[in-house]
């Protein structure tokens, strides 16, 4: 029986969980308000980082009732401890739908809404609720882009364990500047992605067609590659095939893949696009199919293109495939210059940029030691500075 005192302790197995019967009095923003037992000391006693409070609150029934009793919280936590033996299993258990053993995109929404509501680095969003869902969509896509290595749309315990996601959730508590958390949560990164999408989405229905996407970066990407992106090879749902449009969520994957072609997901993304027959290997025919358009575009710019045979020799020398006559996903992941390979076949601007650099300097760039910024982080930082400068110069980017 729980007495109505300000501070109570409950012993649960080996845990001593302090529970505030009248709220924790914390500025951290307990999701259940005044009567929520999830004070920081309770979370600490459970061995949970602060920003697990949302999932814990929902899992104990708080989402339905608006509050959580001590009894419900203890019963819920006992079940978690009995069934889950590490943080990844606990986190999946707290967020998943009953009867599942994996997480789908929607499962992350309550957790991320709590981050938006209570993280000091996102306090300015209180007045801009229309951006909540767009920021949350962006973070969810980044989570699945990095963590869901199987491309299944379902994050398993094993995938979560192999990722850095839970370490990043723990860092939310320590880092007041959310923009320092560049892997998933950075607001500046969201802002860059959303502004880039907004420029292309002229009717602002949060959908873009192939002509809209072709305008990205001044038509740098070939028509054949744009067609492949809209073929369904790298998008979810049937809207692409039915209506010829991709969503903002699809665009997040596209932009991160386009600006950083060295990550495993990005290499898989572009490999899927180039593998026209889906046989798991890029044939010489497939390479020529994409290179033909590059040659035509170079001709129109009065630049002499390398004959395909010469280009092919260069690329085979670059990738060093295991089997003759085809390039596999494994070959490209092993090669440190996958970005140069892909840009050669479908991004005219970046292809010309690589051509101006010596291969040795390209390799040196890719092998530099230390915590070097990723290509995506460099791009996002540069673009954010440009956006801020444009706004300061009186070209405000506004939400319609």
Predicted regions and their residues:
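Long, highly charged low-complexity segments
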Residues: 1, 16-28, 169, 188-191, ...
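HEAT/armadillo-like alpha-solenoid scaffolds in large eukaryotic assembly and transport factors
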Residues: 123-132, 178-182, 215, 300-305
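Core solenoid repeat modules with strong leucine/isoleucine-rich periodicity
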Residues: 153-160, 168-174, 180-183, 187-211
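Polyampholytic low-complexity alpha-helical segments
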Residues: 1-33, 39, 45-60, 83-93, ...
